[in-house]
Amino acid sequence: MGSCWSCLDRDSVPHNHPTKFKVTNVDDEGVELGSGVMELTQSELVLHLHQREAVRWPYLCLRRYGYDSNLFSFESGRRCQTGQGIFAFKCSRAEDIFNLLQDLMQCNSINVTEEPVIITRSSHPPELDLPRGPPQPAGYTVSGFSNGFPGCPGEGPRFSSAPRRPSTSSLRHPSPGEESTHTLIASEEQSHTYVNTPTGDEDGRSRHCLQPLPEGRVPLPAQTQGSDQRDPQVLLQPGQVKFVLGPTPARRQVMKCQSLCPGMQDPPHHNNNEGPSECPAQPKCTYENVSGGLQQGAGWRLSPEERGWSGLAHRRAALLHYENLPPLPPVWESQGQQPGGEAGDDGDSRDGLTPSSNGFPDGEEDETPLQKPTSTRASARSHSGFPVPLTRRRGSPRVFNFDFRRQGPEPPRQLNYIQVELKGWGTARPKGPQNPSVSGAPGPTPHPVRSSDSYAVIDLKKTAAMSDLQRALPRDDGAVRKTRHNSTDLPL
């Protein structure tokens, strides 16, 4: 990745400049390679060098960054001017660089999406409280994300974060002695994937993403996660760490609908739409699969004006809410109850197939507490004409029913022919359905045959004579002027 040499007019930069900082580039062993001036503009990091062109790293291409007591380091992506690599700079104002970079990230609405991470460490303590802000003591550094989230402090051996070539096989090197270093590359057991994407979301959402993570504690067995958990969490368990994000916009709408309709929290376990769980304040709406972390027995409904907004929120926040998985394709199963049947014959009236959203039948009330959504109940009515064998009814096991009933082959269609009345062939034939027994006409005969009621007689001699006469006519290409001497018109 090369070295960073002296910067032009380094001494002219004041110590407390708001956007320019005096930095010194260091290598893997902590050896100083050169000095320069790091400037933070509105869109990129700029390193001014002496008698050389400035090196620029756009904020959109920064994968991660962090700081220690006197060391600021970051990891650049492949689209940067320097290519992929990790750069470390000594600076007495490393914390100021970090804070300013976070503010610029927020102004540019740059978010870093982190995939679900499971960190397995054999030496991980069972209980640990994470600090709310960036840690102050030296010895380790918080690996910060571009949206302001501080990462977990590095444990075990410290790793240096000085600049290295992208082609280096291992980006982990031991720290030189007592030198305080910044860890940007985690251990092999830890798998982080960050995607730095610019978004044009509203300011409220950006502020939500830029809030620091709350304190992470080990969840006790007696504690239960409530459905109104609104802040992201870091759950520390023996041997692993789980990152739990906050509720998505669609999830917030569901909780809002739940607060407006308290009766929806205890839905009846049957397939009838007419029940006390129907929300009186809002009309009946379509089913939205946003019950990832909520109780499974609630069939949530959204208002009609929020349907399009919820679908848009699903597409915009597809990388942020992992509990909002897409619904499974419908699987045909035995219908639990006829729409118009009586309440007492719920087990004997199963003569239809209905798609299941969860993959299991919605049979007896005391076995399956899940309530089918509105779209599923509508599909049940449309497929109520398919018979189900007796073995699939009340005593059948609670498994998938892949017994697809298809209709039999269609009856053969009968084609009706109408006899065309020909002139000069005797009396007319009666019109009506005729048996298409004759498939083709007989071949032409060289001599006249007896006239038939259904076929015409072709005069072959006359046809051949007319054909020869047509071939004998000179072809007129339009280049010869016609007169009375060379006219091609035949005499009448």
From Swiss-Prot:
Q: Where is it mostly found?
A: membrane
Protein modification? Phosphorylated on tyrosine residues upon stimulation by BFGF or NGFB. Phosphorylated by ULK2 in vitro.
Residue limits of the IRS-type PTB domain? 13-115
Q: Read off the Pfam families from this record.
A: IRS
Per the record, its GO cellular-component terms are: membrane
- Asked whether the keyword Lipoprotein is assigned, the reply is yes
What residues show lipidation of type N-myristoyl glycine?
A: 2
Record GO terms (molecular function): fibroblast growth factor receptor binding; identical protein binding
Membrane topology, as annotated, equals: Lipid-anchor
Kindly indicate whether the keyword Membrane belongs to this entry.
Answer: yes
Subcellular location field: Membrane
Where do the segments described as Disordered lie? 122-230, 328-414, 426-454, 469-492
Task: Give the protein's function.
Answer: Adapter protein that links FGF and NGF receptors to downstream signaling pathways. Involved in the activation of MAP kinases. Down-regulates ERK2 signaling by interfering with the phosphorylation and nuclear translocation of ERK2.
Identification of the protein by name: Fibroblast growth factor receptor substrate 3
Name the source organism: Mus musculus
- Gene name for this UniProt entry: Frs3
